[in-house]
């Protein structure tokens, strides 16, 4: 059984491109579009990738979109992903010219904490402390 990681994405790019991704997220979430592979969940990240015509090949796509919001030219996606960040961000950046996908991932079980936002543009904290006090 997988350890589930929370991954938050902040996606910058052309407004038309961001709107396209957002529209697909909402269409799958509202069951307005059928899933792209037999047995797939409507919130599987791969639906977006395949609907965009991207060849996923051997890409690691074990994530499920929990929320998707587009506001002020920024697309915000929250996902649950198995073990850590998936290839979702890489596939989007390769598909769209000028797109930048910032992410932060937290998976407590295997202590996976990572980000590519080194300047803190969207994810300002650089440290995460998990502590447990015996008896509490």
Regions found by a protein language model. Give the residues of each.
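Short, extreme N-terminal segment that most often corresponds to the first beta-strand
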Residues: 1-30
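Charged interaction segments
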Residues: 25, 39-136
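Pyridoxal 5′-phosphate
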Residues: 35
């Amino acid at each position: 059984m997988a350890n589930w990681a929370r991954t938050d994405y902040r996606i910058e790019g052309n407004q038309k491109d961001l709107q396209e991704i957002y529209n697909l997220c909402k269409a799958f979430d509202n069951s307005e579009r059928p899933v792209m592979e037999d047995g797939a969940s409507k919130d599987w990240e791969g639906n977006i990738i395949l609907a965009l015509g991207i060849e996923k090949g051997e890409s690691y796509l074990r994530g499920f979109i929990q929320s998707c919001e587009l506001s002020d030219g920024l697309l915000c996606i929250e996902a649950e992903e198995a073990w850590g960040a998936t290839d979702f961000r890489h596939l989007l950046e390769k598909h769209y010219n000028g797109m930048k996908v910032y992410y932060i991932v937290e998976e407590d079980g295997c202590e996976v904490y990572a980000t590519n936002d080194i300047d803190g543009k969207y994810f300002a904290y650089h440290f995460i402390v998990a502590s447990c006090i015996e008896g509490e």
